[in-house]
């Protein structure tokens, strides 16, 4: 028993050390990407700032694209998103699930803004960033499909709307561009964005005037 306990302790210690190293690499990448841009930053610079070797950086993230992907994943699918998904998972009504897409969208973009605002501004025209963003857009659309399927299965979709059109509208209305234009460019509070989006989704996609 004592031997097994020591092995578990060593395993836990190694896991914690690996997580700390990963965090240092990601923080170094975020700092340098934000100030120099993605394309101008090198793996050697990231390794130096993180206090690790270049092979260690490659072992953790494989490449700059892998590092960027990890940063965006952690920011977008962080605590805010997980809490929103938990709330969504507890709702069975198909129309209300559509409305709650506004809460999920706000959680995603608030998390992204808090963690990656400088990076997004400095690297807005990076081909690598555009490629990663597109992969997340595809994932976002795929994750929304279940809500659309449930809406049509419950026969509560807006009359004349096809399932594919509904999926496209949900994806478009909950996009980063809409959030950015309303919150960052027009000065809306995130609460106002969420309230507007809830009502817009209900009016656009369903036959129900749900409040």
Residue ranges: model-predicted function:
Residues 63, 112, 125-126, 176:
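Short loop-to-helix capping motifs
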Residues 152-200, 208-211:
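Hydrophobic/aromatic-rich alpha-helical bundle segments in the mid-to-C-terminal region
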Residues 60, 108, 172-173:
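Conserved catalytic core of Hanks-type protein kinase domains
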Residues 69-101:
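Amphipathic alpha-helical linker/stalk segments
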Residues 103, 107-120, 128-154, 164-168, ...:
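Amphipathic alpha-helical packing segments from all-alpha helical-bundle domains
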Residues 1-66:
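Basic, helix-initiating cap at the start of DNA-binding domains
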Residues 60-61, 70, 196:
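Residues in the recognition helix of alpha-helical DNA-binding motifs
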Residues 24, 28-36, 84-87, 169, ...:
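Solvent-exposed, amphipathic alpha-helical segments
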């Amino acid at each position: 028993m004592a031997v097994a306990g020591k092995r578990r302790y060593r395993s836990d210690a190694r896991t914690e050390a690996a997580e700390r190293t990963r965090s240092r690499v990601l923080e170094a990448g975020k700092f340098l990407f934000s100030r120099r841009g993605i394309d101008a930053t090198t793996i050697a610079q990231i390794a130096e700032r993180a206090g690790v070797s270049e092979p260690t950086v490659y072992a953790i993230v494989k490449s700059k694209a892998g590092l960027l992907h990890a940063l965006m994943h952690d920011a977008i699918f962080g605590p805010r998103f997980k809490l929103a998904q938990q709330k969504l998972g507890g709702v069975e009504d198909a129309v209300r699930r559509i409305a709650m897409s506004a809460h999920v969208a706000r959680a995603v973009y608030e998390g992204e803004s808090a963690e990656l605002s400088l990076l997004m501004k400095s690297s807005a025209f990076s081909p690598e960033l555009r490629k990663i963003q597109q992969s997340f857009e595809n994932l976002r659309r795929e994750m929304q499909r279940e809500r659309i399927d449930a809406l049509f299965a419950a026969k509560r979709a807006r009359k004349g709307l096809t399932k594919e059109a509904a999926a496209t509208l949900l994806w478009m209305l909950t996009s980063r561009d809409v959030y950015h234009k309303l919150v960052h460019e027009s000065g809306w509070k995130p609460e106002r964005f969420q309230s507007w989006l809830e009502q817009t989704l209900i009016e656009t996609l369903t036959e129900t005037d749900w409040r």
